[in-house]
From Swiss-Prot:
Name this protein carries in UniProt: Trigger factor
InterPro entries: PPIase_dom_sf, Trig_fac, Trigger_fac_C, Trigger_fac_C_sf, Trigger_fac_ribosome-bd_bac, Trigger_fac_ribosome-bd_sf, Trigger_fact/SurA_dom_sf
Function: Involved in protein export. Acts as a chaperone by maintaining the newly synthesized protein in an open conformation. Functions as a peptidyl-prolyl cis-trans isomerase.
Upper classification of the organism: Bacteria, Pseudomonadati, Spirochaetota, Spirochaetia, Spirochaetales
Similarity comment text for this entry: Belongs to the FKBP-type PPIase family. Tig subfamily.
A GO molecular function held by the record: protein folding chaperone
Length: 452
């Protein structure tokens, strides 16, 4: 169908394509459609199949051309992308530049479209990279074990009504809240109802945990909040807000006793509380190793990112921002649209820090995927069996069940990609030089800022 095509590479990993389709193809499709109409059309005064062509054209020419136009464009897209290696991103459909396309049956037809594609870049060989990473020496003590025991105790508690009816630290509270303007009118876009949180334990968006202590059921209060310049949510940082809050319910946790029976309730694998504590210690050691690997990989990707110019398309960045919004909304127990409403209504439309963080994460994803794609060693059936066996051991499902799940969901290729990804990360870690860092506690080490 395509007579010729001109392809231009534009900034932002964007591709511009000029497509030309021969007028002979256009005329052929038009005549075929006209003939089809002629054989089926019923017009008063004529038998079906006997309507003169000139009458059909006079009445339906523009509609016929529009149908042919749509068919030609769709056919051109299909033919072009069947051969073109630069594929469009799945979340960014091609866009036709011309606003009002029309067919002229006596001329070749041409149109221009643009689309965003996966960014191209080269990465240096891992073997040629000299990166040193300072890794803290992490120590654990009994308090780390106790903290995990307390977490399990809370998970296995029963939530009951607090008969005292007064908010205290660790109370589970349901509230309604809304921001107020300077005239104390409600800002409806910020209104939340039936928001549930644990006092002193939850990081609420407006940070009103301590402000509700001492309040009673159905009590309403207007809070005046001021936020420091480096507050965790930048849209609130350095600002002052009025917040109306109402207590709707107050509950508490009925905690189980921490003893051998408690350990047995957690899992059949534990006979005593000491068994549970030993498992927790082993699990903490695994977490430390995983965090150390994450720290080293972060260093690798940040170093490589600084050396690379990756022309990331706009739609890819927008998709990552959407993911970041979803994660933040979930952390704050908000719906996505509700969080966006609060986010944008605050006058905060963009953040350099947020964008930098998203770009950094996105670059890391692109780099690791590039390395996975370039990895010449194919995943064998033996590799798949080993990975399925590992997942079986960790999940309690049989190997057959896990394999059937991946096959039924058409995820075998995803599993192979994941195996390659782990192999690439292992190779990266083997080529990094680890320097002994300062001693830190387990609690400090798992803190995000230390592993940044």
């Amino acid at each position: 169908m395509i007579l010729s095509k001109d392809i231009k590479l534009l900034p932002g990993s964007k591709v511009e394509v000029l497509i030309r389709v021969s007028k002979n193809i256009i005329q052929e499709k038009y005549k075929s459609l006209l003939q089809d109409y002629s054989s089926r059309l019923k017009i008063q005064g004529f038998r079906i199949g006997k309507v003169p062509i000139n009458i059909i054209e006079n009445k339906y020419s523009e509609g016929l051309k529009a149908t042919v136009l749509e068919e030609v464009i769709n056919g051109s897209f299909k033919e072009f992308f069947k051969e073109e290696p630069k594929r469009p991103l799945s979340y960014a459909a091609p866009t036709i530049k011309e606003k009002d396309l029309r067919l002229d049956l006596d001329k070749d037809f041409e149109f221009t479209f643009t689309y965003e594609t996966y960014p191209e870049f080269e990465i240096p060989s891992v073997d040629s990279i000299d990166i040193k990473v300072e890794v803290p020496e992490v120590f654990i003590d009994d308090s780390d074990i106790d903290n995990e025991i307390r977490r399990l105790q809370i998970e296995n508690s029963i939530i009951i009504e607090d008969e005292e009816g007064v908010v205290k630290k660790n109370s589970i509270v349901k509230v309604d809240f809304v921001e107020l303007d300077d005239l104390l009118n409600e800002i409806l876009s910020t209104k939340r109802q039936d928001f549930v949180f644990t006092v002193g334990k939850s990081e609420t968006y407006y940070d009103f945990d301590r402000d509700v202590i001492g309040m009673r059921i159905n009590e309403e209060k207007v809070l005046e909040k001021s936020y420091i310049t480096d507050y965790k949510f930048e849209e609130l940082a350095g600002s002052s807000r009025k917040l109306k809050i109402k207590i709707k319910s107050i509950k508490k946790r009925d905690l189980p006793l921490i003893d051998d029976e408690f350990a047995q309730d957690i899992s059949d694998r534990y006979d005593t509380l000491d068994d549970l504590k030993n498992f927790i210690r082993s699990d903490i050691l695994n977490v430390i190793e995983e965090k150390k690997e994450a720290l080293k990989l972060n260093k690798f990707f940040s170093t490589i990112s600084e050396k690379l110019e990756i022309d990331i398309p706009h739609s890819m960045i927008e998709a990552e921002i959407e993911i970041a919004f979803k994660d933040t909304a979930k952390q704050n127990k908000m719906g996505l649209e509700e969080f966006k409403s609060i986010f944008y209504s605050s006058g905060y439309v963009g953040s350099v820090n947020l964008k930098d963080k998203i770009l950094s994460n996105l670059k890391s994803k692109l780099i690791i995927q590039k390395m996975v794609d370039l990895d010449p060693i194919e995943v064998t059936e033996s590799d798949l069996e080993d990975e399925i066996a590992r997942q079986s051991e960790n999940s309690g499902m049989s190997c057959e069940e896990i394999k059937k799940f991946y096959e039924d969901q058409n995820l075998i290729s995803y599993l192979k990609d994941d195996i390659k990804r782990k192999r690439v990360k292992k190779k990266i870690l083997a080529n990094l030089k680890e320097l002994k860092g300062k001693q830190v506690s387990f609690k400090d080490f798992v803190n995000y800022k230390i592993c940044e």
